[in-house]
Amino acid sequence: SGSKTANIGDGCFGVRLDHIGTTSGMGCGRPRPKPTPGGS
């Protein structure tokens, strides 16, 4: 689940909540707020 997270979760919610952050879009509304440690 690191590939998909690094893709959109990189600037959204690049943590372990890829399945949650991707669905809920926690901060995913922006193009890329900030590279969260974990999405890479």
UniProtKB/Swiss-Prot annotation:
Transmembrane segments: none annotated. Residues 1-8 form a propeptide. Pfam families: ANP. The keyword Disulfide bond applies. It comes from the Eukaryota. Signal peptide: none annotated. Residues 20-40 are annotated as: Disordered. It is found in: Secreted. Disulfide bonds join C12-C28. Keywords: Disulfide bond, Hypotensive agent, Secreted, Toxin, Vasoactive, Vasodilator. GO terms for biological process: regulation of blood pressure; vasodilation. Expressed by the venom gland. The keyword Phosphoprotein does not apply. One of its GO terms (molecular function) is toxin activity. GO terms for cellular component: extracellular region. Belongs to the natriuretic peptide family. Snake venom natriuretic peptide that targets both NPR1 and NPR2. Exhibits hypotensive and vasodepressor activities. This is Natriuretic peptide PpNP-b. It comes from Pseudechis porphyriacus.
